[in-house]
């Protein structure tokens, strides 16, 4: 068994969609990035790749490659799942936290969990998505960006 940890952060910007865990969330700002900037899925991808010692999201999906421009990060997670499977690993669980002052994420967490579980071919009970604020402190508190942390457990298949 191996544990992996992932972290991602993106800047908030008007005129962009806010996508977290593959769910489009109504908000006046979205996350700026080369892909859809889904910080939650990016953190999970990095955690999975790190646990298997298979690099990181930037190595596999560089922002210099136009094929990943505005790509749905669920597709990136699906590719990461395939990379792990081909290397002989399977996912036991995912535990993640999104750090955002706004918007309120609780109404969307069930769908995020289902999306992640579906792509990883595990049960939604094996996926935890939590949300927290920074009580107005730092870049998240000033609503300049959103970050996500993820921890995963994998084992040889």
Swiss-Prot record:
An example molecular function term from Gene Ontology annotations: metal ion binding
Gene Ontology terms describing biological process: isopentenyl diphosphate biosynthetic process, methylerythritol 4-phosphate pathway; terpenoid biosynthetic process
Enzyme class: lyase
Pathway: Isoprenoid biosynthesis; isopentenyl diphosphate biosynthesis via DXP pathway; isopentenyl diphosphate from 1-deoxy-D-xylulose 5-phosphate: step 4/6
Record-marked site positions (Transition state stabilizer): 34, 133
Record has Metal-binding as a keyword: yes
EC number from the UniProt entry: 4.6.1.12
Cofactor(s) the record lists: a divalent metal cation
Residues that coordinate or bind a divalent metal cation: 8, 10, 42
Residues where 4-CDP-2-C-methyl-D-erythritol 2-phosphate binds: 8-10, 34-35, 56-58, 61-65, 132-135, 139, 142
Catalytic activity: 4-CDP-2-C-methyl-D-erythritol 2-phosphate = 2-C-methyl-D-erythritol 2,4-cyclic diphosphate + CMP
UniProt keywords, alphabetically: Isoprene biosynthesis, Lyase, Metal-binding
Cofactor binding mode and count: Binds 1 divalent metal cation per subunit.
UniProt KW Repeat keyword: no
InterPro entries the UniProt entry points to: MECDP_synthase (IPR003526), MECDP_synthase_CS (IPR020555), MECDP_synthase_sf (IPR036571)
Family note: Belongs to the IspF family.
Subunit structure: Homotrimer.
Biological role: Involved in the biosynthesis of isopentenyl diphosphate (IPP) and dimethylallyl diphosphate (DMAPP), two major building blocks of isoprenoid compounds. Catalyzes the conversion of 4-diphosphocytidyl-2-C-methyl-D-erythritol 2-phosphate (CDP-ME2P) to 2-C-methyl-D-erythritol 2,4-cyclodiphosphate (ME-CPP) with a corresponding release of cytidine 5-monophosphate (CMP).
Protein name: 2-C-methyl-D-erythritol 2,4-cyclodiphosphate synthase
Species whose genome carries this gene: Syntrophomonas wolfei subsp. wolfei (strain DSM 2245B / Goettingen)
Organism taxonomic ancestry: Bacteria, Bacillati, Bacillota, Clostridia, Eubacteriales
């Amino acid at each position: 068994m191996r544990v992996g940890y992932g972290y991602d952060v993106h800047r908030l910007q008007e005129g962009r969609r806010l996508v977290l865990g593959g769910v489009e969330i109504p908000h006046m700002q979205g996350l700026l990035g080369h892909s859809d900037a889904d910080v939650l899925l990016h953190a999970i991808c990095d955690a999975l790749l790190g646990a298997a010692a298979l690099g990181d999201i930037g190595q596999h999906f560089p922002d210099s490659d136009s094929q990943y421009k505005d790509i749905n990060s669920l597709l990136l997670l699906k590719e990461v799942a395939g990379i792990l499977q081909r290397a002989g690993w399977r996912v036991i669980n995912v535990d993640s936290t999104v750090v955002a002052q706004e918007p309120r994420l609780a109404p969307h967490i069930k769908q995020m969990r289902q999306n992640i579980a579906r792509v990883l071919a595990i049960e939604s009970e094996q996926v935890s998505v939590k949300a927290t604020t920074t009580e107005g402190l730092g870049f998240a508190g000033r609503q300049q960006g959103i970050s996500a942390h993820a921890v995963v457990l994998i084992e040889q298949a």
